[in-house]
């Protein structure tokens, strides 16, 4: 017996709009964070727009050891290793991946979206811990990306539940 063919299922409009808004914000914040990191490398005295006071300094957090490779990849692959990129590069890749995979309603895409969201939230919790307890700073850019990652987790969870229900309805035997 052949496997059942699932009809095309579309996601709700609110999900697409929310995903585009969150991913667009994430992409823009990642680009800005990358800019701040580069400027801080070029000029250590550079004051970014997100440096609002003595306790609110995004450039200090972004230029710290934990601003590259999550503070982990440098010790594994070397400070100049190809994988020891600024966290903003990983964020940019993540938000673009979320945006592109969000355009399809496949089961594999939904699982990749959910898995990558879980990883991003775990990473956000780790970086939030570093930000608060180690660096003792408040980075508005960082915290905003943590919130965006959590919102994407919710959006992806809702998508998985919605698609699962739609596919279940398609697979149920039709009663005449």
Swiss-Prot record:
It catalyses: phylloquinone + [protein]-disulfide + H2O = 2,3-epoxyphylloquinone + [protein]-dithiol; phylloquinol + [protein]-disulfide = phylloquinone + [protein]-dithiol. Disulfide bonds join 50-58, 139-142. (S)-warfarin binds at residues 87, 146. It is an enzyme of class 1 (oxidoreductase). Residues 1-13, 103-107, 161-176 are cytoplasmic. Belongs to the VKOR family. This is Vitamin K epoxide reductase complex subunit 1-like protein 1. It comes from Mus musculus (Mouse). The gene is Vkorc1l1.
